[in-house]
């Protein structure tokens, strides 16, 4: 079998959440960060023929790049054979017990208290601003009738910040994320936030959804 560019893009992103991954037979991909504060799940076009673990996903993907059009053979229980023309690589599976894996049960938000659409350009600008100004926090703030996304240093009242209005609200709230936890592929997202400090980012172009925990100092009135 071959992996599509779309699947490779997802796997590269998943490697930033957790360097290891346990693939499951079928077309579902799921991963969770070692700290268990980011969970991602996606559906891919390929049907994986077996369960197998990869300890260093980034290394595995870089190995695939040694081939222009790699064919993956999963006949062996211990490794995958990567072939193209006269070249081939043998890549051994990892013991599943050494991989931090998501719970089998699907994630359901306990409540759905705030929702908005985050467009591609808005996400890009927020993350660029956070990098330029070296800001560690992303806050979803509801006040004065609008929902704003703000990158800032919430511990420093005199820090630079950058904000974008993404919707309207009648509520007052301040949900805080660590910018380093916004490990999502570029694109537009339907975002839903629970006051129980869990959020869902559903990509509108890829079949991928992220569940990201918020900081305990978040507020919701």
Where are the regions that the model predicts?
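Long, charge-dense
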Residues: 96-116
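DNA polymerase processivity clamps
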Residues: 1-93, 112-221
């Amino acid at each position: 079998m071959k992996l599509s560019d779309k699947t490779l893009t997802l796997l590269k992103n998943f490697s930033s959440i957790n360097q290891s991954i346990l693939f499951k037979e079928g077309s579902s991909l799921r991963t969770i960060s070692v700290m268990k504060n980011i969970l991602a799940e996606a559906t891919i076009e390929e049907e994986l023929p077996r369960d197998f673990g990869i300890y260093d996903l980034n290394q595995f993907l870089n190995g695939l790049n040694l081939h222009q059009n790699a064919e993956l053979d999963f006949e062996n229980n211990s490794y995958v054979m990567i072939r193209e023309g006269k070249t081939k690589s043998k890549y051994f599976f990892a013991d599943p017990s050494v991989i931090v894996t998501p719970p089998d049960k699907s994630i359901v938000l306990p409540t759905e208290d705030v929702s908005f659409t985050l467009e591609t350009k808005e996400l890009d600008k927020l993350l660029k601003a956070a990098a330029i100004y070296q800001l560690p926090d992303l806050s979803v703030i509801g006040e004065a009738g609008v929902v704003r996304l703000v990158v800032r240093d919430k511990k420093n009242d005199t820090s630079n910040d950058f904000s974008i209005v993404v919707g309207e609200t009648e509520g007052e709230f301040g949900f805080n994320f660590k910018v380093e936890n916004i490990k999502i592929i570029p694109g537009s997202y339907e975002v839903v936030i629970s006051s129980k400090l869990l959020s869902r980012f559903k990509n509108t172009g890829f079949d991928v959804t992220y569940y990201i925990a918020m900081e305990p100092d978040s507020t919701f009135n």
